[in-house]
Amino acid sequence: MSSAYSVRSFPVSIPAVIMETDWTEPWLLGLLAFHLLCLLLTCFSSQRYKLQIGHFLCLVVLVYSAEYINEVAAVNWRLFSKYQYFDSRGMFISLVFSAPLLFNAMLIVIMWVRKTLTVMTDLKTLQEERKERRRRRKEE
């Protein structure tokens, strides 16, 4: 079976990578399932702060490790893949591995910012109510 693309002629654009990838390979389907599980954990961990922090740190560590994972996968691709997808620039690993993880991390940060704004709004409301009660007591 011929290669989807060789390392020398690896596509430089995201649409080319997406179009030339065999998305039916079992390891890619497993990676997709992993990303879906990460997304579910991101969504359902919003009420469990410690779990969300741990999940966020795992996401960041995995993204940080992507270069090493790419190097190992480039050497051992025949063990799990039909084609050599792992180029020296890291385009493929960035697209199929790091980008979804960074998306999850971004969602978590958005949740944290939203939660912080909600707490700040609630605090300001309580301060205003307290100020109003003091003013009323003073008038009496």
Swiss-Prot record:
Keyword Nucleus in record = yes
Membrane topology (UniProt): Multi-pass membrane protein
Q: Which UniProt keywords are given for this protein, alphabetically ordered?
A: Coiled coil, Cytoplasm, DNA-binding, Membrane, Nucleus, Transcription, Transmembrane, Transmembrane helix
Annotated GO biological processes are: cell migration; eating behavior; energy homeostasis
- Tell me which stretches of the chain form a coiled coil: 118-140
Looking up InterPro entries in the UniProt record yields: TMEM18
Q: Which intervals lie on the Nuclear side per UniProt?
A: 47-52, 113-140
Q: Which residues lie on this side of the membrane: Perinuclear space?
A: 1-25, 74-91
UniProt subcellular location = Cytoplasm; Nucleus membrane
Question: According to its record, what are the GO cellular component terms?
Answer: cytoplasm; nuclear membrane
Q: Which domain of life is it from?
A: Eukaryota
Q: Give one GO term, molecular function aspect.
A: DNA binding
What segment(s) does the record annotate as region DNA-binding? 113-140
Q: What Pfam families does this protein map onto?
A: TMEM18 (PF14770)
Motif Nuclear localization signal covers 130-138
Membrane-crossing residue ranges in chain numbering: 26-46, 53-73, 92-112
Its family remark reads: Belongs to the TMEM18 family.
* Assembly description: Forms homooligomers, independently of the DNA-binding domain.
The record's section on PANTHER family has: TRANSMEMBRANE PROTEIN 18
Function of the protein: Transcription repressor. Sequence-specific ssDNA and dsDNA binding protein, with preference for GCT end CTG repeats. Cell migration modulator which enhances the glioma-specific migration ability of neural stem cells (NSC) and neural precursor cells (NPC).
Protein name, UniProt field: Transmembrane protein 18
